[in-house]
Regions:
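Vicinal oxygen chelate
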Residues: 3-5, 44, 180-186
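Active-site acidic/histidine proton-transfer and metal-coordination neighborhood
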Residues: 19-20, 36-139
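Short, solvent-exposed loop/turn segments at secondary-structure boundaries
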Residues: 2-7, 53, 88-93, 151-154, ...
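Glycine-rich, proline-tolerant flexible connector loops at the mouths of alpha/beta enzymes
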Residues: 1-18, 81-88
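Histidine-acidic metal/acid-base catalytic patches
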Residues: 12, 19-22, 36, 101, ...
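Conserved beta-strand edge residues that scaffold enzyme active sites
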Residues: 1, 32, 83-84, 121-122, ...
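Conserved alpha-helical segments that form or flank metal/cofactor-binding pockets of metalloenzymes
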Residues: 25-28
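Soluble or luminal CAZymes and related metallo-dependent hydrolases
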Residues: 6, 10, 54-61, 95-99, ...
Length: 247
């Protein structure tokens, strides 16, 4: 939500629209001016709380988003934190830890949790970061396609590793980049069921880890709204049929 819309009046109006549509708000995602997903290199430089030059301002903005989520009655905020530095002894990593702890303490004061979206780190590095932060309101929004799109690991194996921290999920699909280009070039997002995630296996694994929360469909083609709506509709049908099959 943009700054000008983060008001009590806007929250009241939005809640009314959601109520009329039968929609329950399960998470409020934060995003920032200046972020770009044009390619992986640009994503590293611009996304989330990792870029040092924008970190302080973005932490403050996430605090305001947390306050707005509270007005909406939502106990979960989420974001792409960015590419967490690999060197856990570096000053950049330690400063990111401190900023994340500061943000989480504010979020906790609103009786909320923060879910980090997967994809930009391997499962092991994400677990290291969560454990280093040492806050009990830091969890994961698991997006299986992002593991493929970023080339950071098999999504099912990653889900098994991080399962105890998963509090929300995306249902999104994608195909791997060519061998030798994974992690350097994007994979390709595709309609649910057409990619390399393996949706039935994904849902079965969610059951195995005890996940019983919402299955949030994400289809990131805002430039083609009609196709986006059609793909989301097909995704609903696929998930319903798979859930019936799995039981």
């Amino acid at each position: 939500p943009h700054q000008e819309t983060r008001t009590a009046e806007s929250a009241e109006k939005f809640l009314k629209r959601c109520e009329d549509a039968g929609i329950t708000i399960t998470a409020v995602f934060g995003g920032f001016e200046g972020e770009s997903y044009a390619d992986i290199e640009t994503t590293v430089k611009t996304v989330g709380l990792v870029p040092e030059e924008t970190r302080s301002a973005r932490v403050q903005e996430m605090k305001e988003i947390s306050d707005f989520a509270k007005l909406l009655g939502c106990d979960t905020v989420a974001l792409h934190i960015g590419f967490v530095p690999e060197d856990r002894e570096s000053a950049n990593y330690k400063n990111l830890l401190a900023s994340t702890q500061d943000l989480l303490d504010h979020i906790a004061s609103n009786s909320q949790q923060l879910n980090l979206e997967t994809g930009q780190e391997t499962a092991d590095h994400l677990l290291d970061f969560i454990n280093d932060v040492k806050r009990d309101n830091l969890f994961i929004n698991f997006d299986p396609a992002n593991m493929i799109l970023y080339g950071t690991g098999d999504p099912i194996e990653a889900l098994k590793k991080v399962g105890k921290f998963v509090r929300s999920v995306h249902c999104k699909d994608g195909t791997w980049a060519a061998e030798g280009k994974r992690g350097k070039e994007w994979g390709c997002e595709v309609p649910l069921g057409d990619g390399d995630v393996g949706m039935e296996n994904y849902l079965r694994t969610l059951d195995e880890i005890g996940y019983a929360g919402p299955l949030t469909i994400e289809r990131e083609i805002p430039e083609d709204r009609e196709r986006q709506k059609a793909d989301i509709g097909q995704a609903v049908d696929l998930l319903v049929s798979l859930k019936e099959k799995i039981g």
